[in-house]
A protein has these predicted regions:
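Extreme N-terminal leader/targeting segments of oxidoreductases
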Residues: 1-38, 56
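N-terminal Rossmann-like FAD-binding beta1-loop-alpha1 element of flavoenzymes
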Residues: 33-63
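Conserved N-terminal glycine-rich FAD pyrophosphate-binding loop of Rossmann-like flavoproteins
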Residues: 67-103
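Rossmann-like flavin
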Residues: 92-176
C-alpha cells in the first residue's frame, strides 16, 4: 500500500488562535538548500520551545513545518495553560507508580511555570494571566474525573472549586 501525502497548506484552521493571531505573520515555503546546526521539524509548542532553548547554545537553528507555526492541535487550544492530564488519576498512578507519579505531577507543574517564564523572559506580546481555568465535563464519568482531580489538587494546597452547572454558567457568563 502506498500513501500519497497531502499537500501542505499555509491556511490556518478556523480557531480562536487564528482569529487573534498577528495577521502580519506569514511564513513562506523553504525553496532553497540550507545548512544548519540544528533542524527542528514541527513548529508547535514543543518545536518552538526546543528552538528557544537551543538558541541559548547556538544561533544556527532552523524550524520547518508543513504549515504555519501553531497550526496543529497544540495551536488550536485557545491559550489555556494548566497542569492537567486527561487520564483518570488512578490510571496515571498505575502507569507511574510511587515516586514516578510524583515526578510526573511535578513535571506538569513545572511545564506551566516554564510557559510563563518564557513569556516574561522573551517579552512575548500576549495577554498571559495566571488566573485559573475551568475544566468542564458532563455525565457521571466526567464528574468522577473532575472530582478526583479537584480533590488531588486541593490536597496539594491548590485553590480548587468543583462547580455545579448553575455556578459554572454564572462564572462563564452563559448557560451553553
Amino acid at each position: 500500500m502506498t500513501r500519497t501525502p497531502s499537500k501542505p497548506t499555509l491556511n490556518w484552521p478556523n480557531s480562536l488562535w487564528q482569529a487573534t493571531a498577528d495577521a502580519g505573520l506569514n511564513f513562506g515555503r523553504l525553496e532553497e538548500s540550507i545548512e544548519t546546526d540544528l533542524l527542528i521539524v514541527g513548529a508547535g509548542y514543543t518545536g518552538l520551545s526546543t528552538a528557544i532553548h537551543a538558541t541559548e547554545n547556538t544561533n544556527d537553528v532552523v524550524i520547518i513545518d508543513q504549515a504555519q507555526p501553531g497550526w496543529g492541535c497544540s495551536g488550536r487550544n485557545g491559550g489555556q495553560v494548566h497542569p492537567q492530564w486527561k487520564s483518570e488519576l488512578q490510571a496515571l498512578k498505575g502507569m507511574y507508580p510511587g515516586d514516578q507519579f510524583n515526578a510526573f505531577i511535578q513535571t506538569l507543574e513545572d511545564a506551566v511555570d516554564l510557559v510563563f517564564d518564557l513569556i516574561n523572559r522573551y517579552q512575548v506580546d500576549c495577554q498571559a494571566e495566571r488566573n485559573g481555568s475551568i475544566i468542564a465535563g458532563r455525565g457521571s464519568k466526567a464528574i468522577r474525573y473532575l472530582t478526583q482531580w479537584s480533590q488531588f489538587w486541593a490536597g496539594k494546597g491548590k485553590s480548587v472549586h468543583l462547580l455545579d452547572r448553575e455556578k459554572t454558567s454564572e462564572v462563564i457568563g452563559t448557560s451553553r
